[in-house]
Amino acid sequence: AGGSAAATVTTAGDTPVVGDIPTQTAPPTSTNLNAWLSSFYTAEDKRQTKFPEALPADAQPFELLVINICSLSWADVDAAGLMSHPLWSHFDIQFKDFNSATSYSGPAAIRLLRASCGQTSHKNLYQPAGNQCYLFDNLAKLGFTQHLMLGHNGQFGNFLKEVREQGGMQAPLMDQTGLPVSLLGFDGSPVYDDTAVLQRWLQTIEKDSNPRSATFFNTLPLHDGNHFPGVSKTADYKVRAQKFFDELDAFFTELEKSGRKVMVVVVPEHGGALKGDRMQVSGLRDIPSPSITNVPAGIKFFGMKAPHQGAPIEITQPTSYLAISELVARAVDG
């Protein structure tokens, strides 16, 4: 389950107040924890987003861009001293307790691509899911063209294979020809410049005659071991994060000026464990502890008739992928 499951129970006096998650009141023995986890999966199994059967006549077409970022948690943002970066105030909705439920890339992408159903066990990520669970398939049924974009080659850890086989994303990989390489991965593979990739996305959807599209974009500029070409030492995390946040912020400003109708959803995969915690040393992600799974997810709407004014709406209660699917379904429904 990973992350802050305990935080899902708040207390009014001495009585636990539960949202949609089983209460946690028994002593933390192995038997009790396993029983709770089993009841959690049973509860999650009943949950799914209901997408409309067809689009309402007055539904506004828009582009959905889901940005899945490797190695970024709130704890990492804090450790890098970037909590007050202007990017964070650029969102309309910000999730302060979003649980990625995993500390590895493949499972994180699968969970996001299957966001329209409740959480499942790690093992079940590698079993087929019902068609209703695949967020991008739900959108395709409503006429959205699917796009797949990577800021890397997708080979490490069979990432692209898992996105296709377990995530159900069959769209062709967006053309990477001629993209500038800003970093090299620890295995020497190219990590493409994010501004260039986002511009390539804009060019691609501008050529597309369908005004409705849904893009899954996975990028890893913050991954441990990335280094600048010609330098063997791992590039400083803060330097890379500052550049990436600056680029995303500038891209948001560009979208605002364009008038294009876009819903951008940012969901990091998991943290980079920049600082250690009581469970494991920095850099280790074997245990999906809350400092790794509490990630800065956010949503920004562009081209709205009445854009959100002021500071972002902060969602402080525990959330995960189903919340993203719900918000996308509501946006689609007009």
Where are these regions (language model features)?
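Active-site His/acidic residue clusters
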Residues: 157, 201-202, 206-246, 250, ...
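Active-site-proximal alpha/beta segments of enzymes that process anionic O-linked groups
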Residues: 3-7, 13-228, 294, 320-321, ...
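Surface-exposed helix-capping loop/turn segments at secondary-structure junctions
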Residues: 253-262, 334
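Long, structured stretches of catalytic cores involved in phosphate-ester chemistry, encompassing
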Residues: 240-251, 259, 267-268, 275, ...
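Phosphate/oxyanion-binding loops and surfaces in catalytic or ligand/nucleic-acid-binding neighborhoods
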Residues: 119, 142, 270-277, 304, ...
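Active-site rim elements
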Residues: 121-126, 185-189, 234-241, 252-253, ...
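Catalytic-core regions built around general acid/base machinery
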Residues: 86-87, 135-138, 243, 247-255
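Histidine-centered active-site microenvironments of extracellular/periplasmic hydrolases
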Residues: 261, 267-308
